[in-house]
Amino acid sequence: MSEQEIGKDYELKVRRNPQSLLEEYPRKGNNIQSTHYCAGCGHGIIHKLIAECMDELGIQERCVMISPVGCSVYAYFYFNCGNFQTAHGRAPAVATGMSRAEDDAIVMSYQGDGDLASIGLNETLQAANRGEKMTVFFVNNTVYGMTGGQMAPTTLIGEKTVTCQTGRDPNYAGHPTHMCELINTLKAPVFIERVSLANPLKIRLAKFAIKQALTIQKEGKGYSFVEILSPCP
């Protein structure tokens, strides 16, 4: 389906929060009016897109989200479904165990680039190569966001971070890791897609990809991977 078709067919509606998001996520002190995410962060948008798809597919009661160390770990405050918090990079192993132990579960691994493409790279590729029944949502903001914006494996050439203040130099730090392209070299994955949150149309396309990935899970077809290019202010 083309971008034009997506934009044409998408009906804008004023909606309440999806049932797959918790009604309240209370915080304390000076943070009482805010979420855990910085202003301009893409995580909130992604949460709502995933939750809407869970509702529309009728899979909330079957869903289990794996949220490892990083900004991703806060997902358990917001999603109204099962959740496991894991050590940095270990989400694919935990997701594999959950998927194999509970065959009817819809297993989602929600990971950032500093987690999935760095300390968790080996486990990510091995789970994809085995074709494990899981859906991976890879939130790529090209930096280590939680710890202050250091260079990550996905940081682009010339992109400035606190640890490469003149921009990433491939002669010193190598080239960015492109996860979709890496996973596409494997035979087992069923669905691989890269989307972004750059504008309203791109957000609609992101939801379309998320729903496709979860549909594959619902139908028990195997491994799906959605990379979401997300801002980190």
Task: Indicate where each model-derived feature is located.
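Thiamine diphosphate
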Residues: 2-145, 208-212
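Contiguous hydrophobic segments
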Residues: 3-17, 33-35, 108-115, 168-183
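Gly/Ser/Thr-rich loops at beta-strand to alpha-helix junctions
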Residues: 42-45, 114-116, 230-233
